[in-house]
Amino acid sequence: MALILILIAFPSFKLLYLMDEVSDPAISVLAEGHQWYWSYQYSDFLNRDYDNIEFDSYMVGEEDLEEGGLRMLEVDNRVILPELTHVRFIITAADVIHSFGMPALGIKCDAYPGRLNAVSVLINREGTYYGQCSEICGILHSSMPIVIQSVSIEKFLT
């Protein structure tokens, strides 16, 4: 009986490890949760001053929402990613536990202070994808939307 369990366990552990391994991503994006906004950093790209591209993303309030905008889901700075490209998200938190949730892309990853978690994604088509912090992290927890916009590789590079 123990031999059967061992024969099943070792290949299973190897498969679990390989499933979670990100194979040579083209882009890495650091997502850091704060009370109550997200910070992003494209570590593979540099701006004109040769610094990493980084920005904060806050929810757009109802008074600033444009016509047709989604209440409680729209942000001032979206994450822009190319379609059909392997992307690795490195997720962490600065203060309390958060959770980076993007159901349409199959992402839900907890963000812990002092710990880095990585998930990979391949976006198959252009579009705008909405998600939110999925961990109750304080009084303004509902004010932490996540918006990822997927564009063609040509648009992304310009």
Where are these regions (language model features)?
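Non-transmembrane, membrane-proximal soluble domains of secreted or membrane proteins
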Residues: M1-T158
